[in-house]
Curated annotation (Swiss-Prot):
The protein's name in its UniProt record: Protoheme IX farnesyltransferase, mitochondrial
Function noted in UniProt: Converts protoheme IX and farnesyl diphosphate to heme O.
GO CC terms, sorted: mitochondrial inner membrane; mitochondrion
Membrane topology value: Multi-pass membrane protein
Catalytic activity: heme b + (2E,6E)-farnesyl diphosphate + H2O = Fe(II)-heme o + diphosphate
Amino acid sequence: MFHILNKGSSKSCIYTRPCLKRFYHQHYEHTGKLSRTFFSPTHIKYNRLSTLDTSTSTANAAPDPQVLTFLSKRMQAAPLYPKPSAFLELGKPRLTVLVVLSTMSSYALAPYPGLSFNTLAWLTMGTALCSISANAFNQSMEPMLDCQMARTRSRPIPRGAIRPEYAWLFATLTGIAGTSMSFLVNPTVGWLGLGNIVLYMGIYTPLKRISIVNTWVGSLVGAIPPLMGWAACSGGDLLSHPGGLITAAMLFAWQFPHFNAFSTMVKDDYKKCGYQMMAWKNPALNARVSLRYALAFLPLSYAYISTGLVGPWYAVPATGTNMFLIARAWKFYRNRNYQNARSLFFASLLHLPLLFTLTLACHMIKVWNDSDSKNPVLGSEEDTLKY
């Protein structure tokens, strides 16, 4: 139990004043030693959740009864009219923005004439709502597990900001709206959007407590948005040009160094809740897979050159950017400690946006250079100029 030791008093009390922005919070650990840790006001507000003893949970054990009781009370106390911010949190806005950016990047990279603002608008809104729906479904299915992990216990449902039935309704409505908008682009985009929601909610989420294969399934979820962007630009054709599949393969490969590093940082929480992750089930495999897929970026980047999407000069910045990620994946492979995992995680956050920015820049340079002659990728000279 976390306590504040009052000056001049041998008694301790729970500190409840929300006016202080930051303060020293003293508590006894299980070892009996006194330590000091900075806690933010958000942590103070939900510190009762952190005091619940969930250390005895295992992969096959039921949630602690104390956790069930506390969560039940929180859900019952949830407001009848939740704040809009609670719905926003259900959709994980930062993750949704990244998903939309990957879709738009693929749309911009596709070498097809007649790019349409209306198509891009429907694609953007449809992708965003599909992502919001999948994230909301995920949180609706796992409140019991979310309240046991430090990084997720302040989500809307565990902290009592929104009722579970409202979360389910929100996920359903955004899913219907998102897939409807995606179908307005073309049927291929619509089916990809719907399939991604089903894959995330129906397969990936329950598989997390069954097998480490969940990481590969989750990577498929991340690879679908670029296919949606490519299909939107190509009229639903994903096979006549390999660029869309290459972009999707990049997003698939990126998930492994990114997520494997992150799961290493929070592996104790995952183990406590029974999530079957390589980080604690097989740490050596976890590091090998991270390095393997980091190395995959080299041939995937060069594949862009062979398809004519970018010029040969693209190899220089692409190689440098990929080596930035590979170097940290190699360090993590050699020494699987927290520091190297953290370094790889933040490197992955920089790597993908930088690589896509370079790819789009080199693609546009090639388009401009080829604008006065017929381009075999774009088709006729007239289409090239229109593009």
